[in-house]
Amino acid sequence: MKSIIITGGAGFIGSHVVRLFVNKYPDYRIINVDKLTYAGNLANLKDIEEKSNYRFVKADICDFDAMYALMQEEQVTGIIHLAAESHVDRSIKDPFTFARTNVMGTLSLLQAAKLYWEALPEKYEGKRFYHISTDEVYGALEMTHPEGIEPPFSTQASSEHHEAYGEDFFVETTKYNPHSPYSASKASSDHFVRAFHDTYGM
C-alpha cells in the first residue's frame, strides 16, 4: 500500500484534497498532517474519519524530527504540501510566523523527504513531492483590455487577442513579483522546492 502525506489537510482546500484521495484511492494510505491553527477544522472531515485508509496526525511541519519519523513509520512515497499561513493581513502584522511556517516548514519537509528517500535502495524513483503555491507570488494583474470588453477565459484566446486584451492571465513565464510578507514567504518556498529538484533530483 502506498502512503501519502497531505499537509494542511484540515484546511478548506486541504480537506477537499484529503477527502478526494481517501475516497478515490482506497488502496492508498492517506496521512493528514495538520497543526490545527485558526485555519484548520477536523469537522470538515467527519465523513471520512473512520475510513481504514485514513489517518490524522496533529503535528507542526517545522518539527523536522516528527516529520522524518512519520515518513519512516508510514513508508511515505508521496507528499502533497498544502500547509501554509495564508492570510495576507496577518502576514503584515506577523511576518515572522509566515516565514517560519511557509519557508522553514517547507524546508523541513523537503529535507526529511530527501534524507528518507535517498536512503532507500530505489532512492527517488516513484517518489513525488507536490508543492501547492499561490498566484500571490506573481503580484497583481493589470487589466489592459478596452473598457466594457470582457477578457477571454482561455490562454489561447488571450494569445490570439493579446493586442486588445493585454496580460490578463498569469502564465508559466510570468515573473515573480511578491509584495506582501505572505507572498514573499510563498515565493521563497517555491524556490526551495525547485532547488531541491535541481540539486538533488527530487
Predicted regions span which residues?
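N-terminal Rossmann-like NAD(P)+-binding domain of SDR-like oxidoreductases, especially those catalyzing
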Residues: M1-M202
